[in-house]
Every structure is written in C-alpha cells, then in structure tokens.
C-alpha cells in the first residue's frame, strides 16, 4: 500500500506498508479500496434473523454529539439556541412537561438521568438516549464537506438539550466543561457513530451465530478473537417513523465470540477492517458496536497485521491460534481467549 498523508506543518508524506488497517469511524478507507459493503437494515429473508424487518432499508442508528458538563457552582445558563423547542426533550425524564413519552416504560427521574454519566471532578457525560441528544442523520455516503455541515445540526441539537437541562430542569450551574476538549465549541472532535458501512468479509456474523453458536453450519466460535455480552441495543427514536422499525432495545443474547473473518474483506488483499465496519449484520451490530468489543477488534487487527508482515503471509493465511497467542502475551486480556476456546 502507498498512502499520501498531509502532515500538519510537515507537508505531504508518503507512507508505504504491506498491510493497512481501516479504523475510520465510517469505513471510508475500505470504500476507497473497493471493498463491498452494506448500509442499513437487511431483511429477515436476507439474514434469517427473527427480529429483522420484513424488508431491507437504509436506516442507520442515531448518532450522538456527546457533551461533558461541569458544575461551575453558579448560573451558567447559555442563551436560548435558535429554533429551540422544549417539546423535543420533554420526556427525557420524569418532569411536569412530560405528557406523552415515546417510551413510557423508560421514563427515569431527572436525578437518575443526570447521574447516568456522572464523572469525577463534578462532571457529567451527556449521552442520553431517551428523548435526549440522540440525533438521526445518515451521513455515511456524504462528502467530508457535507458531513461537516450535517454535524453542525447534531451539535446544535445537543446544545438545545443542554439548554433544556439548564432552563427547564434547573441544572443551571452545569455548563460545557472548559477543560476537556481543545475545541472552540468545547464539544468533542467527533460524534458517537453507532453504525457504519459493514463490509463483505470472509464471514458474516449475525444474531443466530450469537444465540446458537453450536448449531450453525459455520462453526464461527472456533475462530473467536473478541468477546461481547452486551444486549442488542439500537438507537432509533430520533428517526421519523421509528415506530415501524423492530423493537431493538436491549434484546437479550448470551456472551458470544466474534470471529476473525469479520475483519478480513473477501475481495481485497492486504487490508484489515476494524471499528464498526466489520462484516456483521445490522442487527448484531447493536452489540458489536460497543466500546469493549471495538477495543478488542482493534487489538486483534494489530496482532493480525503484525503476524502477516512478520511471517510474510497473506492476512487470510495467518493462524487464528497465533493471533490469540499474541493476545495472551498481553496478559490483560488473556482471560478472553479461554472464553473463545
């Protein structure tokens, strides 16, 4: 691989490598390399997953522009954002303005809501899925310029929610932390993307492989390189028409092993795909997207790349056992390997 990289203050640099890893948020490198991929929900007929929709669509999960608030001990209420509508957030928690919640069985107290993401040093992470700052937009195929413009709306939506917390719920001493991100707007560099392109890999992991690993024709559990145990959790309530989608809130699954073949494109040599762009179904992405799994995917990708280069092998020729041994040598995650065996 040969890549041209514009290094800040150093001009254009050329990077050559035998193996490349796509760890982008939306699988942009995989697309540039010609890897096949899917976006949105497959149908029940495509994946044979019982909870998949009857027809495919291009709907992805809501994103969230997370904010970190800090208690300043004084009123730091921001000016009312343009277009602010408190009805958008009325049922983020139990309060007098909540009349018709979208999810009546998920209306928490405001104290539980604000402490959901409580951090040290009088700070609070605002990543609230229940009529909070989730925001629907499918920007996967947009240009960088289009994405930038679209994300301004997501940022604005989060600021509207911050104003709701301050003005409607009385948390007027909480404001954007000024010591977390070196950005002009005090927000993170990127939003939380819950869904990406999903490549066509050597294998495609789906819900059935997690629910009943030992009865499948493909014994994918034998090639496990990461484990997860979080329920299938999709965020869709900010999509207009979410009522017509499957109910994918905390669908229970057992602990599962993610197979190595999900990281390897089936038609492009020398490329490993990580993050949320691996070869999984839309449904099971609701659990493989979680950070503990994604961290393991990154470690597996690094181990796989190192072994391929060291042994002068193609990526799909590297032994999964050797990849696991590299994990074992790291010690901190060796217990995961035994769960996969």
Regions found by a protein language model. Give the residues of each.
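Short, hydrophobic/aromatic-rich segments at coil-to-beta transitions
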Residues: 1-3
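Flavin (FAD/FMN)-binding glycine-rich loop and adjacent Rossmann-like elements that form
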Residues: 6-341
């Amino acid at each position: 691989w040969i890549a041209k990289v514009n290094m800040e203050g150093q001009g254009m640099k050329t990077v050559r490598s035998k193996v490349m890893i796509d760890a982008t948020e939306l699988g942009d490198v995989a697309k540039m390399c010609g890897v096949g991929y899917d976006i949105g929900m497959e149908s029940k007929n495509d994946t044979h997953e019982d909870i998949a929709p009857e027809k495919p669509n291009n709907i992805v999960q809501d994103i969230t522009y997370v904010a970190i608030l800090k208690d300043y001990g004084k009123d730091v209420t921001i000016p009312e954002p343009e277009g602010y509508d408190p009805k958008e957030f009325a049922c983020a928690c139990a309060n007098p303005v909540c009349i018709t919640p979208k999810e009546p069985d998920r209306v928490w107290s405001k104290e539980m809501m604000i402490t959901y993401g409580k951090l040290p040093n009088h700070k609070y992470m605002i990543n609230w899925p229940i009529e909070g700052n989730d925001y629907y937009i499918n920007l996967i195929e947009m240009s960088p310029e289009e994405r930038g413009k679209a994300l301004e709306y997501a940022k604005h939506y989060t600021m509207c929610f911050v104003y709701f917390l301050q003005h409607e719920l009385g948390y007027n001493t909480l404001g954007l932390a000024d010591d977390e991100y070196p950005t002009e707007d005090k927000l993170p560099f990127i939003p939380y993307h819950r869904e990406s392109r999903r490549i066509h890999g050597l294998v495609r992991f789906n819900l059935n492989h997690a629910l009943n690993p030992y009865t499948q024709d493909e014994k994918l559990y034998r090639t496990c390189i990461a484990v997860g145990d979080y329920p299938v959790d999709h965020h869709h309530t900010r999509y207009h028409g979410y009522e017509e989608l499957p109910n994918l809130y905390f669908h229970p699954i057992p602990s599962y092993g993610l197979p190595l073949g999900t990281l390897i494109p089936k038609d492009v040599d020398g490329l490993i795909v990580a993050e949320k762009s691996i070869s999984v179904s839309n449904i099971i992405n609701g659990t493989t997207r979680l950070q503990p799994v994604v961290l393991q995917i990154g470690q597996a990708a690094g181990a796989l790349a190192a072994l391929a280069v060291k042994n002068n092998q193609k990526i799909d020729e590297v032994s999964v056992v050797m990849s696991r041994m590299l994990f074992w040598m790291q010690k901190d995650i060796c217990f995961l390997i035994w769960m996969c065996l």
